[in-house]
Every structure is written in structure tokens, then in C-alpha cells.
């Protein structure tokens, strides 16, 4: 009997292939603990540098509920059976979103002659996801790492929880997310640090201060990558 992984692989045509995008495409992974301010800063960078902002979590949620989706039923089946959505699916959705964005033939800085600029928020969360993305889609140009203390993140998430309505914005869930981040995502950051690709930003300070530091670092990165 074929497993759910087999079914997903068949449906998504998940076969080994060369990376989809070449070095003209800038890919920045955006990582940090829950409440570190990743989404807030991504929104600012979109305005500053015309990035396309992709969230792996948002793509999965949208695909699950999209009418006519070829992946939605399979994602729902994984959830129903209590199994994790395979990394192949997440990577494929990111690849599709990037392909669709490039097909729009955007104008402006960073979007001519086959170029593109992507911020991928909250991904990769594990090393195998990083390896799969780099093999199938393309190499990461850099990793933006928003670092702060667990105390700061907890305070921010509890404050957000007062109005967000998110079930995971409570102390018990937050602590589990912290543990997952430390055990699974920190090794990803350490891996890219060894490659000299990590840009660490202290996100303990105000949103505006973090933005100024981030904008300066990304401007320097882009000027170097396009030189």
C-alpha cells in the first residue's frame, strides 16, 4: 500500500532535479524565535527594496483551503492522520510562488534581466528543509537572524495574544515553540553562520531601531551581490 508520503510525492512530481533558480535570484531566509519581529521587519524590507515576501506557513494554510488546489486534499490528509506535512510539499509551494512572482516580470530595482528578490520568512526550520530547498530551488544568498532574549519574546507574544486570537499565543504553547526553535532551528542558523551567510540583528530594541540596522545591512548585502 502506498504511504501518504508516496501519494504526496506522486501528486507533486517530486523528482530529483537541478536547482530551479540561478544566482541572479536573491534569496534571504528570515529566521528568529517566535516574537523576534520577523514579519514586522519583512514588511519594512518589502517597501525599502522591492522584495517579494513569502511565508511558508501562510502558503501551506492558503493552499489547504484554496478551491481547486491539487495539493490541498493531501495537506488536509496529513493533518487528519496526524502526520507532518512533508518538507517536499513546503519547498514545492515556495518554488511555485517564486516562479509565479518571476513570471509577473516586475519592473524596478532587482527585478530586471531574470533577477528577483525574495524574503522567505520562518523557513527553513530544520536542516533537512534547508538542504532540500538548496538542492531543488536555489542557494540562499544570506540569512537574516533576528536575535533577542526569551524574556523579550515571551512579553511580546503575550501582549500580542491579548488581541491576536491565535491559539498558540499562550504561555504553554509559547514555551513549546521556544524549545522547538532552540532544538531544530538554531542548528540551521549555526550551519549558515559557518558559511559566513548570517546577518545577525539584535531585535530587542525598538521596531524603528531594528529597521534602521536591518535596512543598512541588507543595502550593503545587495550592493555587494549586484556588483
Curated annotation (Swiss-Prot):
Monomer. It comes from Lentinula edodes. Transmembrane segments: none annotated. The keyword Nucleotide-binding applies. Gene3D superfamilies: P-loop containing nucleotide triphosphate hydrolases. Its main location: cytoplasm. It is an enzyme of class 2 (transferase). A ribonucleoside 5'-phosphate binds at residues 61, 83-85, 122-125, 129, 166, 177. This is UMP-CMP kinase. Its cofactor is Mg(2+). ATP binds at residues 35-40, 160, 205. Pfam families: ADK (PF00406). HAMAP family: Adenylate_kinase_Adk, Adenylate_kinase_UMP_CMP_kin. The lineage of its organism: Eukaryota, Fungi, Dikarya, Basidiomycota, Agaricomycotina. The keyword Kinase applies. Binds 1 Mg(2+) ion per monomer.
Amino acid at each position: 500500500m502506498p504511504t501518504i508520503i508516496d501519494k504526496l510525492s506522486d501528486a507533486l512530481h517530486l523528482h530529483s532535479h537541478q536547482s530551479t533558480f540561478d544566482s541572479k535570484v536573491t534569496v534571504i531566509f528570515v529566521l528568529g524565535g517566535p516574537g523576534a519581529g520577523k514579519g514586522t521587519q519583512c514588511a519594512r524590507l518589502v517597501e525599502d527594496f522591492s522584495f517579494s515576501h513569502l511565508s511558508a506557513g501562510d502558503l501551506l494554510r492558503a493552499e489547504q483551503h484554496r478551491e481547486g488546489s491539487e495539493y490541498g486534499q493531501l495537506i488536509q490528509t496529513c493533518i487528519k492522520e496526524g502526520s507532518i506535512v512533508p518538507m517536499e510539499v513546503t519547498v514545492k509551494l515556495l518554488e511555485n510562488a517564486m516562479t509565479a512572482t518571476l513570471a509577473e516580470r516586475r519592473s524596478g530595482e532587482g527585478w530586471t534581466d531574470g533577477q528577483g528578490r525574495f524574503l522567505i520568512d520562518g523557513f527553513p526550520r530544520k536542516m533537512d528543509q534547508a538542504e532540500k530547498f538548496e538542492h531543488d530551488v536555489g542557494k540562499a544568498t544570506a540569512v537574516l537572524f533576528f536575535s533577542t532574549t526569551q524574556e523579550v519574546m515571551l512579553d511580546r507574544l503575550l501582549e500580542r495574544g491579548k488581541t491576536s486570537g491565535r491559539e498558540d499565543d499562550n504561555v504553554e504553547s509559547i514555551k513549546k515553540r521556544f524549545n522547538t526553535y532552540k532544538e531544530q532551528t538554531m542548528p540551521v542558523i549555526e550551519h549558515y553562520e559557518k558559511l559566513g551567510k548570517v546577518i545577525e540583528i539584535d531585535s530587542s530594541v525598538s521596531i524603528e531601531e531594528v529597521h534602521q540596522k536591518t535596512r543598512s545591512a541588507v543595502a550593503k548585502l545587495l550592493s555587494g551581490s549586484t556588483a
